[in-house]
Every structure is written in C-alpha cells, then in structure tokens.
Amino acid sequence: MGKRTAENSAANGEGEEKHPEIGVDGRPEKEPTFQDYMRVFKYASKWDLLAYTVGVIASIGVGITLPLLNIVFGQFASKFSDYAGTETLPGDEFRSKLSELCLYLLGLFLGRLVLGYITNFAFRMTGVRITSAIRQDYFTALFSQSVHVLDSMPPGYATTIITTTGNTLQLGISEKLGVFVEYNATMIASIIVAFIYSWQLSLVTFTAVVFITFSVSLVLPYITKGQTNQTKSEAMAMSVASEAMSGIRMIVAYGAESRIGSKYGRFVDEAKKHAQFAGPFIALQYGLVFFSSYAAFGLAFWYGTRLLLEDKINQLGAIIVVLFSVMMIVTAMERISTPLLAVSKATVAACEFFTVIDAPRPEPGHLTDPDVSATEDIILEDVTFAYPSRPHVKILDNLNLRIETGKVTAIVGPSGSGKSTIVGLVERWYGLKDQYVISKPVEKPTDKKNNGGKEEDEQELQELSFAGDETGPPVDLHGRISTCGHSLDDINVKWWRSQIGLVQQEPFLFNDTIYSNVLNGLIGTKWENEPDEKKREMVHEACKEAFADEFIEKLPEGYNTAVGEVGIKLSGGQRQRIAIARAIIRRPAILILDEATSAIDVRGERIVQAALDRASKNRTTIVIAHRLSTIKKADRIVVLRQGQVIQSGTHEGLLTDEAGLYYNLVNAQALSLGEQKEGNEVIAKEERPSSVHEKAHTESTIEEKPLEKKPKNKGLLSSFGRFFYETKSNWWMMALTLFFSACAGAAVPFQAWLFAKVIIVFGYLPDESKVRSESSFWSLMWTVLAISAGLAYCATFFLSTRTASTIRAKYQKQYFLYILHQKVAFFDHDDHSQGTMAARSAEDPRQLEELLGSNMASVFIALWTLMGTIAIALAFAWKLALVSLCVVVPILLAAGYWRMRYEIKFEEMNNAVFVDSSKFASEAIGAFRTVASFTLEVAICDQFRTLNSNHVKDAFKKARWVSLLYAFSDSATIGCQAIVLYYGGRLLLSGEYDLESFFVCFMSVLNAGETTGRALSFGPNVAQVRAAANRILGLRDSQVKDGPEATGEQFISHGDGIEIELENIYFKYPTRDVPVFDGLSLTIEKGQFAALVGASGSGKSSIVSLLERFYDPDHGRILCNGQDIATNNVYTYRRHLSLVAQESSLFQGTLRENILLGVEDTVDDAAVHRVCQEASIHEFIMSLPEGYQTQVGSRGVTLSGGQRQRVAIARALMRNPDILLLDEATSSLDSESEKLVQEAFERAGKGRTMVVVAHRLATVQNADVIFVLGEGKLIEKGSHRELLAARGVYWQMCQSQALDK
C-alpha cells in the first residue's frame, strides 16, 4: 500500500513533492523550516498586521531607551565629577543641569512605560488571535479527514497539538517575538552609541563579549548533553510512574511495590547522574560570565583612563557610556536566547499544525437522494484491506459479502478476523484506495558522535513499541463496496452517514446533558432544523424506544442531567441506552451495532438487547457480537476467519454443522439449562432495572464524602527544618554553599564601592601621574573582584546543583514508594487520580529541589547582596540610603520580582487562556468516530469556534492590565534612578555628602533592588513548595503506618486452598455514601470453585476488592481459615492470593519480567515454562524470536487481548496462590480466546480456592457453588443445576444468555 505524506507543497508553491524519511513508528518524518514559521502570519487579519507593525515599532523604541539611558547616566557622572571632583562646574549650572538630566530620565521612563505597554499588548493580543485562528483551521482540517488519519498519529497526539503545541506556537509569535525585536534594537543601538563615544575603547571592551561568547560556547554543549540525557531519563521514569498508577491495583495485589519502585529508581538515579554531569559546567558558566563582567569594568576604566589622558576621550562620561553599553550588549545577548528558543520551538509547532492542515482531504462524493438510496443491499466484492497504521498486515482477504436490506446480518468470528473492519469500511472511516499517513516534524539532527550511543538507545526504545508489527511488502488494497450499483466512494459521505445509526461497545457521550446528547443524533438529518418543540418530542420518543426514559425520569434533573466526561455519571447500561436513543432518533435506514452489549451485566444486557431488537425492526442492521446469545434471532449470521467468510446462515442452520466454526464458538459459550418448560417468559420486573439499583447508582454519582481526615499541614519553615535535618549527610555541602553565596553576595556592595573609587580618580586631574597610578590600582582591584566573584559563583552553583540533584533523587524515589504503598482507597479520590499522582511523583520532588537546591542558592545570594548593600549604603550616606530604602528599593524589588516571575509564569498564563477550548477539543478528538458517524463535524467546529472567540475576548480583558503591570515593572528602574539622582544631587549641592558617598549609595541601592528582585523571582514559589512538602510528608506518615514493615499476625495456610467466610459485612466505598453490602454473609469452602454473579452494582467485584484488602469493611469480618484477615500483615497475607482482572495490566519490560512480577527473580526457567504451559501461552512465547525476553510494550500493546490475559494467568499461577481471584477475566475476549483462557482457569483452579466474577454465565456453570448477589445481600446460592431447578433470579439470567434454545 502506498503512503502519501501530508505535505504543504501546494500551499508553499513547491512544485516537486519530496519523499520524507520514515521514522521507527512508521510515520514519515518532515523537517520544519523557517518558512513554516513565517506562514503562520498568513492567519493575521489586516488589523493584526497593523497591530504587529505598531508593536514592532514600539519594541524598537523600548530597546533604544536603555542605550539612551547610558548617555544620560554618562552625562550625570561627568557633571557630578566636574562639580564635586575637579570643581570646574559652578553650583548654579550643576543645579540646572541636574534638573535637566532628571527630566530626561523622567521622559525615558514615561516613554518606556508607554511603548512597553503598546508592544506587550499588541503582541499578546495578535498572538492570541492568530493562534486561535490556526487552532480553528487545524481543528476543522482534522475533522475533515478520515478516521485512518487519526489512527496514524500516536495516542493523544492530535489533542496535544491543539493544547500544548498551540501554546508553544503562541509563545513564539507574541511577547517573545516582541522581546526578540527589543533586544536586537538594544544591541544595535548600544553598539552605535558605544562606537560614537569611543570606537577604540569599544573595541577593547568588546573583548569581554568575545570572551563570554567563547567560554559559553565551550561549556554549553556539555550542559545541553547532560540536561538532554537527564530529560530522557526523567521521561522514562515518568513512563514507569504513569504505567504504575494505571495498574496500581495489580501492583498492590502482587506486592510488586518494591520491584516497580526499583525500576523507577534506576531511571531517577540515571537522571541524577546526568544532572551531576552538567552541574560543574553550569557552575563554570556562571563563574566565567561573572568574572568577565567584573573584569570588563576594570579593563574599561584602565584603558579609558589612558585614552582620557591622551585626549582621545574628552570626558569621564564617555568611559561610562561605552562600558555600560558593552555590558548592555552582553545582557541582551544573554537574554535573547530565550525568545530565540521560543521562535525555534514555534517553528516546529507550526510544522505540526501544517502537516494536518495541508493533508489531502478525502473526496466527499457527490451522489445523494434520490440518485441513491440507503434501502438497498450493501455489497462487498473481493475486498482486500490493511489498516494504514499497519500496512503489512492483511485484515480482509478477498472478502465477498452481501448485507441484505431490511434484515439483521450478524458478523461473528475470532479476534482479528475483520468484524469491526467491515463496520469501518461501511461507515467510510477507511477506504480501499491508497491511504496516506500524517508526517512527523523532526528537528534537524545534531552530531551524534561522542554521545555514548544515546540516540541508538532511544531508537531502540521506540522500536520496542512496534515489536509486534509484521514486515514485508505492503498489502495491495483492492475490491469494491457498493449499493444501488454505485460505489460508496461516489456517494456523498455526510449524506451516507446520516442514513446510519451506530451503537458501539464503548459509547461516547459528550460532557453535556442527556437531552443534548440524544439531540446530537438529529444533526445532518432532515429533522435538524425542526422547531425545538418537535425536537423535544422526538428526543422523548427515542428515549422511550430505547428504554432510557424510565431511569431519566427518576433523575432529579431529568433530561437536563449532565452526564459528565464520557458519560461517567451514568452506568454502562444507561450510557448504552442513551447511545441507542441517539442512533434511532435519526430514524436511520441502516443500524450498526458493534459489540453494543459486551461490557454490560446480564440484567442490563437484557434491557439493552430488548431496545436493540425493537430498534432493528424494518431496518438494515449489522450486528458485531462476541456474546452469541445476542444474535440468535438474526436473519443471517456470517462467520469470519482471517478476513474471509467461511460460513453463513441462520443460527439453527449453522448449528447443524457440528464441524463448523460457529458450532464450536456456540459450544464454547453454551449454557446447560436443564429441562425446558413451555413459556420461558421472564418476570416483567426484569425488563426494567430495579428502582433501588437505579436510584443507588444515581446517588453514587452525585454524593461524595471525604476519604479521611487530612493530616494537618505544616508550615514552610517546619517542612524546611524537617528536610534539612534528614539531609544532614549533606550539611557540609550546604554550609559551604552558604559561605560561598555570602562571598558572591558581597560582590555587589564591593562593586559599588569600587565604582565610586574609580569616579574619584578622575577628580585628581590635571595630576596625570596620580590619575594613572590610581587607575591602575583600582583597575587591579576590579580584577581581584572579578576573580573572587567568579570563584564564589562557580563554587556556589557547583555545590548547590550537586546537593539539589542528590536530595531530589533521594526524595523522588522515596516519594514514589510512599505513593505505591498507599491504600487503594487513596487513589479513588479525585485529587489522587492516576494522572495526578504520576505527575506529582516527579513534580513534588522537583519543588523540593527548589527549596533546598540551586534556586535557593540564588535567593541566599540575593539576601546577602541586600544586607551588604543596605549596610554599605547606610555607612556612607544614611540619609540618601533611607530615602532610597523606603521609596526606591521596594519599587525595584517589586518590579524586578514581578518582571522575572511574569516571564517564568508567562507560559502558565498562556496555557490558561485556551483551557476550556482545549478540554473541548480533547473530548471531541476522543470521540472522533462518534463525531464522524453522526456527521457532527460542522456543529463541533462551530462550538470550538465559539469557545475560541470567547477566549480571545477574555484574553483581551486580562491583557490590558497585565501589559500595564509588565510595562511598569520593566521601566520602573529608570524612574527610580531619576529620584535617587535628583535627591542625591541636592545633597551634594548642600555639601552633606561627597562624591564617593553619593556613588557608593547610588550604585548600591540600584544594583541591590534590581538584582535582588530578579534573584528572588527565581526562588521557589512558597505556596507550591509548601504544598509539595506537605504531600510528601503526609504520604510518608500514612505509609509508615500501613507499609510492609507494619506489624500484624502472620497468615497461616495449610495448602489445597483456603476457606473464606464473610460474616455480616456492611460496606460502602470511601468516596461514595451509597451502601454496597447490607449484612452480607457467605462461605466458600476450602478448594471450591466459587462464582459470584448478579446485576451491575450488586457488589461482585467489591468482594474481590475486600478479599484483596484494597478496602476494609465498615462492619463485620472476613475470615480465611478462621483468621480475621484484618489482623494479618497485609503484605504477607496477599502472598497467598493472585488476581486476574478484566484489564490484564501488563507493564513495560519482557514477558519474563511480567510473569515474575509478584515473585523473586531467582525462579528458574523450568518453573516459568511450567506455569506458562498451564496458562496455554508457552508455545506462543517460544514462537517469538526473542522468546521470554520479548518486550511487551506499554501496557502489553504488542500482544492481543487473549495473549495478554493468558500472560496474566501465568503471572497469577507463578505465585502458587491458595486463593485465585478472577474478576471479569474473560469478558472482553472473543469465543476462541475465551475458550483457551477458560481451560487455563480450570486447570489453575485445582488444589486451590477459586473465586470468579463473571457476566458470561457459561464460564461459571461448572462452579462448585454460585452466589447470586443483589441489592447488597445474597439472594441465592447453589450449584448451576440447583439454581436452575429453583427457577429464581439465576434461572432468569440464564434464560437471557442461553444459546441453544
């Protein structure tokens, strides 16, 4: 099958299509170009372009203000020196010049404030508007594609583009772009100013720029390498954490906390190693930058003095202007990397958007009613098909099939036989023409040499996920699907889908009301524009037909009840009935039922099946089913195997062929019903779920109670003290960090003093020898300061980064284990969801790193700087210092803090803008098939457009004030300088202070305020750190109480199974105030095969959870061999149990590692092979090239459902348990896989107690005892035959599933 890549050649005017490389994930790779970035601006309206133009001009103006400030400050220095040093300037003239220069500063302040506001507001709003437009275009383009396009993307990829990638793009085209223009303007203007005042001094001083650039370029590759590898290791650790949180019950059940914790810890230790590799280079970079900055001052003053004495410079101000201009260039060069990186990321983000926007869109077809009709047969002729995401694997092989109009056609067969593929082809999600795959943007490859083979390792990791894919030539797609003599490709796709009603195994409901979800079924039909009253009538009618009205009317909000995300507030049966109502309100000519009842319990299935039977009348109906009891009445049953029709006929007709596949499938699910009597009517009340059950479920979705009393939160100082005490092995490093940070902090007050001394030197004129000797001495002092500051900063950051990485790794590993050792009830709370706890396992220790690591070192430096500058300012000029401290320093502190905090938090603020539309996009993309099937594309895109429009309006309101605050914080320094200079000048005129006192105070105050404000902004966010510290300490305290070291009686087993007694159990889940058990009592004898059956919500799985001690009963006891399990050590007790759940929960790693999850690694191969033979999986494993060392991929994705389940059985048997718990272990398997798994269970049950929860009663009819649960109590118990003879609830359940009637 050929692949065409979604190139933007048409849009870019490229005449020749390039063939990109194919990545390891099968997707073509495309390299982003700057052309992608520039193309984004085509989404700008004329008003956006005008705003951009104004913003660029304003940014240039903002950038020029600082070089102009240097000129004014140089003039100040000259005039102050002339007045107080050489005394060549009269007092009145100095007073006049002082006022004039202060007015210049005030003008620069106001100009920067206004221009800063304009540029920030203009770039922010245009960025939001353009990003909104491109998100909308992407969203529309995505929903114009076929389903296979989404299939070609990794899971969650499209949602990530809308959310994270969209935010990245916005960053790169908004303020960051304005900052880029500003810094370029600053650099250019600074160069011009410096060379105008003294080209010779400029060239000499520029050596500092060259030195900084050269030194940074030397160490940066090593820093990048270390941080890149650290990020990779952290990503792998995060992958382990995510997988662990999603399979937490299985980890707890198998006592695998330590094993998973060790696996996680290996990646954390790797990340620490890489962080410590980069640490010395980060420290060296800091040291070199600060050394060169201070050294540049000494060099400039030394050489400037020489030029002044040689009359090549006419005043002191020229030296100041050149020096400050060069320092400004260094600062701009340092800061311009941030917007450059943002633009680079935005280029990649733009490419991500355009790969979908430019993707060729499928031909919609042109035929509609009356040219074609949906009431004719659908014919598949010689159809051969493979999915675009797996082009080498043939799914359908020359398939020929006729789906007759007005009749029910059921399609059955083993997994992978092509049943659901036929649905996809009829729905036109896929076609029989060559399919294309969306390309994957990749950044330009860097040099891979000397990288320790990391690239190869990463590629190998990626390839593991595709280990199961077959290779070979792509499958040649061919064949024809037609109706009314026309190919489906020629029929308008929206019209065709409007004739189809689809009900899937997992129905997707939007986070809206029941009424709106059902109403969605009318979109695209001729009733779409009917009056609201008519629509409401149709909704009610459809819900009645689907048996949904009965539970809807019992809800407090009725049809206006919100269903929650993906319908979470409704039970499975309720969701399914809403989906049926949504399908039949369309009054479709064709009804497709794809596993519509497979995930519903017996009682729910009975009701849903009745609704489906009613909906199928007089319609062309296609039914895909694993439960063959649901398709006995089909007009025609088609049996598939390996993509071909091998049998077809009625249920009765196919059963006559005892050698046929259908007979074997039925036999695998057959229930023995004993002697039948006439009139197998089912009690009427079974047609409807009990009001108690419905009410209970409804209440359970609304009312929640707190998990438990939360531990009292500790303050930041208390948490800091506790962590500080626990890290006493690192005290010596912390003490040294504190000492060197004090040395680094002393550099700023010392710099202020040296600056004043240098200014005084020029007061010795015209004594040139004195000036020369003094300038040499004080320039040497600058060099001493440069070396000292460089060493202090280097030592501070070397020690702090090393300490931080050590502390983070220690607590990250511990914290992850604390999480794993929590009770299962802990994870039921909304605040402790799987995703939240996976993220916290990395984020909370990172916050702790900020509390005790390098960022805190910056805070220490800032505090030492503040104390030092205040002390020296008060010592030299207390009056000016007090005014500055009371007025200027608070403003500078607040401005510096806010500005840097704003820059750090900008991305967070940016993300918040589109949060609602991002959620909606995520939901819509998750329902892609539902949207396509019900022709909801236009409605979805319109809703997304409305949300985006609202976000833009909200952003406009926020931007007005945020931009003003940012502009003020950015320009406040200039205003404060004007205040200090004016007041200081007045004090000089009055003779209260000399030149040295003034300049020491002036430089101290300005440097202290701005430097400290910036440094403090890098400090930890107090609220976040406090919350993270409390979570870590809180989980540790609860973990110690419940951990594996906890005391408790040792559980005693005598082999051959365990007797289980539940005595008067009362139980409700901690997060719901709805009783599950109300005095339940039952006994399972030693070595028995016991089955638990009953309606959904009857407590079957809850018994398994109680036996596993995931929860404790509120009242009553659970006894095993006469021992109360609550008194046993939970970890030793669980060693006697093994759990196999509906979700097999395999983890990344080899098959052997998964099988040995709950036991020691020292088990020999013979034992592993033996349990795999018992689980009927050994032969399959040995057929794999890597055998037991085969990687299973994330969540076992490279294995089929049946294979995963058999591996899970082998894992359970490996523990040689006394109790085997099987919770819906076969409910999602096809008949063939189920039969293999069932045989494995029956072998596994010998010599042990086996407790089985099942919906399919055929899997438990051989049980020694069957317990029928309902409404919190035991309704019936007995063997299969005994319960049939009683003709009670169990008999009714069997009637609804029987296959041989």
Swiss-Prot record:
Binding-site positions, ATP: 413-420, 1094-1101
Protein induction: Expression is highly repressed by the histone deacetylase HDA1 and the beauvericin cluster-specific repressor BEA4. BEA biosynthesis is also repressed by the activity of the H3K27 methyltransferase KMT6.
Region (Disordered) residue spans: 1-30, 442-461, 682-708
Disruption phenotype: Does not affect the production of beauvericin but increases the expression of BEA1 and BEA2.
Record domain ABC transporter: where: 378-667, 1060-1296
Localization terms from the record: Cell membrane
Residue ranges of domain ABC transmembrane type-1 in the record: 54-345, 735-1024
Membrane topology qualifier: Multi-pass membrane protein
Membrane-crossing residue ranges in chain numbering: 54-74, 103-123, 177-197, 203-223, 281-301, 313-333, 745-765, 779-799, 858-878, 880-900, 961-981, 987-1007
Family matches, as InterPro entries: AAA+_ATPase, ABC1_TM_dom, ABC1_TM_sf, ABC_transporter-like_ATP-bd, ABC_transporter-like_CS, P-loop_NTPase, Type_1_exporter
Glycan attachment points: 229, 511, 618
Keywords from the named record: ATP-binding, Cell membrane, Glycoprotein, Membrane, Nucleotide-binding, Repeat, Transmembrane, Transmembrane helix, Transport
Composition skew (Basic and acidic residues), residue ranges: 15-30, 442-454
One record GO biological process: oligopeptide export from mitochondrion
Record-linked SUPFAM superfamilies: ABC transporter transmembrane region, P-loop containing nucleoside triphosphate hydrolases
GO molecular function annotation: ABC-type oligopeptide transporter activity; ATP binding; ATP hydrolysis activity
Record GO cellular component, one term: plasma membrane
Family indicated by similarity: Belongs to the ABC transporter superfamily. ABCB family. Multidrug resistance exporter (TC 3.A.1.201) subfamily.
The name this protein goes by in its record: ABC transporter BEA3
Source species: Gibberella fujikuroi (strain CBS 195.34 / IMI 58289 / NRRL A-6831)
Upper classification of the organism: Eukaryota, Fungi, Dikarya, Ascomycota, Pezizomycotina
